[in-house]
Amino acid sequence: DASKSRGLGDVYKRQKNPVLGLLNVGSEHIKGNSVVKQTFEDLKKISPKINFYGFIEGNDINKGNVDVVVTDGFSGNIALKTAEGVAELIFTFLKNSYKSSLVSKIGYFLSKPAINRFKTRIDPRKYNGAVLLGLNGIVVKSHGGTDAFGFCNAISVAVSLIENSYINEIEKKIKI
């Protein structure tokens, strides 16, 4: 039930009145499949009670306009894997560029600490573990292609949710 999304977002983000955005193929109301359109209408009906931004596109996810992205697992997984692929592509291009000349190699040597900080910051293994909200239990879905570091981070997410009585907080918030 989309109307409970804000309550789920409140608890998960530990933030009062988080901004919700609904992932869609466009920001126009005529775009999207029937499920997305119906979810939009459901969220719009309760928008006085929630902070509903409206439709967001894939390129809006990381702009900071929304705190919680409402999506189905299929579209969400595509968005996530696309972002990971773009990050890998950027690093491949950078690596090839730095190998192109002696000056580039020196530039790489000088900028390596900054590049490593950036790479660490966007490492998808660090954020591994998609929380499936709205279930009567803790479910954290790990990326199938991760390594031990990423898998441990997904387990840490699950442990944190358990330690913080996540399910009880959700039940209180949305009054199941």
Predicted regions located by residue number:
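Short, structured patches in soluble enzyme cores that scaffold and shape functional sites
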Residues: 22-26
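Single conserved hydrophobic/aromatic residue that forms the stacking wall/gate
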Residues: 1-8, 12
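Glycine-rich phosphate/nucleotide-binding loop
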Residues: 65-69, 73-176
